Amino acid sequence: MKHAYHKWHSPALGRDMELQVLGHAGARVLVFPTSLGSYSEWTDRRMDRPGVLGEHLENGWIQMFCLHHVHEESWYGEHLHPGARAWRHLQYDRYLRDEVIPFSAGQNPNPFVIAVGASFGAYHAACFGLRNPHLVNRIIGLSGLYDKIGRAHV
């Protein structure tokens, strides 16, 4: 199975960002990390193995773009002013929209995009998908926190 690591300096964020690409074809799946997780956690947790998502990746049904985050600089940056945290989240959204989506389309022309995440990644998947319905066809949120201010769990 194809595994590739990519890193570039993000103009939207003003810093280097990393991601991991798994698979060779299929629906493009944006995989958001859990709370303070990383781009490698889905492979670290063997989600790409047979019996989990391995067959889907091997058969070209999905291609996963495992993303990194800016949690400490946004919602988890409790030392920051709330407005600064919200602004950083919007910059992350711009990074996804203006950099990750075009990058993934350059790797794989399949127009079908799925945003998926677990825990705080589910919040990011839902947020990005709902904010960009013209770019995202499906959202899968697993055990996510959807109301950060009220800390309500769904």
Language model segments and positions:
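Non-catalytic cap/lid and distal C-terminal segments of serine-dependent acyl enzymes
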Residues: 1-153
